Amino acid sequence: MQRWLSVLVVLVSLCFGWSAPPPQQQAHVFDATVPHRRVHLSYLLFVPASYATTPETRWPLILYLHGGSRRGDDIERVRTLGLPHKLESEPDFPFIVVSPQCPAGEIWTDVEAIDTLLERVMRDYRIDAQRIYITGHSMGGRGALYFAYRLPLRFAAVLVLGTYSPVPAWGGKLAQIPLWLFHGTADAQAPIAEMKELVQAIEAAGGHPRFNILEGRDHFILDVYDQPDIYKWLLEQKRGAAVTDKPPNT
């Protein structure tokens, strides 16, 4: 009996054109020409479930950069960790999210490719250009800081976790952007001392980064992406607004 009910459901679905709704986070391939070369980049694109029913709304966008373990040519691996993994079960997440995949053997340094990808998404979707944010973990955290350093007028805020090899020389430009940095005191892969040097450089340049030191935590602090407060904070940041006084470290 159960078998015949299943068959009936399938037949009715075919007759009436019913089908399962597509996933909100879909894989894409980006091909484009930047000066003197072609770029080929796989990425996941998350669009909130309510996007289609809110035609007057321009949405904030998060650019998510994964860590070194997700490099390669299988975009589905990006879906299994960090913010993309969270999105698999949150169709009403209130941001559009772009999650590119870094090619094998490379790190996040291709500014032209990333900026061109963002331009493409902004062309195709209703994006609030004043509320574009960048985040990442480990190698992706370093990439987020680097892209913010190279493109200081693009991003309204930066949120990074367990950042690998941050560069204090970036402090001057990063001081102009709202920053929230998370780092574990027991991180053996990305020592917290390196992040403290960057924070000092940013503060010396007049910046007010928010720096959360996570006592006893190691490199794997991706559960930070489950904290609602970080998204509330992101939405409070808007490009062109003054960087506010330094909030308390918590």
Predicted regions mapped to residue ranges:
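A domain-start/cap signature at the N-terminus of enzymes
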Residues: C15-L61, T135-H137, R142, F147, ...
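Histidine-bearing beta->alpha loop at or near hydrolase active sites
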Residues: V97, G184, L214-I221
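Conserved alpha/beta-hydrolase "acid-adjacent" motif
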Residues: A188-E194
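Short beta-strand/loop motif that positions the catalytic acidic residue
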Residues: W180-H183, D187
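Post-His helix in hydrolase/transferase enzymes
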Residues: L222-K232
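Active-site machinery of serine-nucleophile hydrolases
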Residues: L61, L65-T116
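Primarily recognizes the serine-hydrolase "nucleophile elbow" in alpha/beta-hydrolase
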Residues: M122-D124, Q130-A175
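Gly/Ser-rich "nucleophile elbow"/oxyanion-hole loop immediately N-terminal to the catalytic nucleophile
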Residues: A49-T57, E106-M139
